[in-house]
A protein has these predicted regions:
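Metal-dependent phosphodiesterase/nuclease catalytic metal-binding core
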Residues: 32, 125-181
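Acidic/polar short surface loop at catalytic or gating sites that assists cofactor/ion binding
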Residues: 87-125
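Active-site metal-binding motif and surrounding structural segment of the metallo-beta-lactamase
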Residues: 46-95
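Conserved beta-strand hairpin/beta-sheet module of binuclear metal-dependent hydrolase folds
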Residues: 8-52, 153-171
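Active-site metal-binding loops of divalent metal-dependent hydrolases
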Residues: 17-19, 36, 67, 101, ...
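Short, Lys/Arg-enriched N-terminal segments with co-localized hydrophobic residues
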Residues: 1-7
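Short Pro/Gly-enriched beta-strand edge/turn motifs at strand-loop
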Residues: 9-17, 110-112, 137-142
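Structured loop/turn residues at beta-strand edges in well-structured enzyme cores
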Residues: 54-57, 92, 120-123, 137-139, ...
Length: 181
């Protein structure tokens, strides 16, 4: 991922465009923007990042759209890799942005996957459950409800950079008003 000159050229890379069933061998739905912010962490996240030459330690923000397995079951592997391979000192800050209540479920998922192995990294993560905020590099974001299974707290995100770049990620939404406004 590259940034050019004094004005940054933003880049969004779709690291996966499949659904829960991986049609035609496509990786699960997964995106990265500006080389350091990922949207969701599916089971195929680690391989998608490696295939694209992206180091797990360079990820600074993980935005979670909802709590279905095809969107979060890669989190234990990403955090484990970061702990034991790419950021052993846990010196690179990591923020996870998710709906209220998601932290508890994500921590439970990590404990089930690797009991006791991720307590340290989980304690260093900055958890953000607010409906809006900003990244350190100038992306303002807003989380909004979308049309999907209510039991998994489904949300989309709108993003706007301080230089005016904008995009929306809908998660697994069907048509709904927030996507058009």
């Amino acid at each position: 991922l590259r940034h050019f000159g004094p004005t940054m050229a933003h880049e969004i890379v779709m690291l996966g465009t499949g659904n829960a069933f991986l049609p035609n061998g496509r990786h699960h739905s997964f995106a990265i923007f500006d080389g350091k912010h990922i949207i969701d962490a599916p089971p195929t996240a680690l391989i998608s990042l490696r295939e694209n030459g992206i180091k797990v330690s360079e990820i600074s923000t993980i935005f979670i759209t909802h709590l279905h397995g095809d969107h979060i079951f890669g989190l234990p592997f990403l955090l484990l890799e970061r702990t034991y391979i790419s950021d052993r000192e846990l010196s690179q800050p990591l923020t996870i942005v998710a709906a209220p209540g998601a932290r508890k479920r994500i921590e439970e998922l990590c404990e089930i996957a690797y009991p006791g192995s991720m307590k340290k990294i989980l304690s260093t993560i900055v958890w953000n459950e607010k409906a809006q905020g900003s990244t350190k590099d100038g992306w303002n974001w807003n989380r909004f409800e979308v049309n999907h299974n209510e039991f998994v707290d489904p949300f989309g995100y709108s993003f706007e950079s301080t230089d005016g770049a904008k995009f929306v990620h809908s998660g697994d939404s069907g048509p709904c008003e927030p996507l058009y406004s």
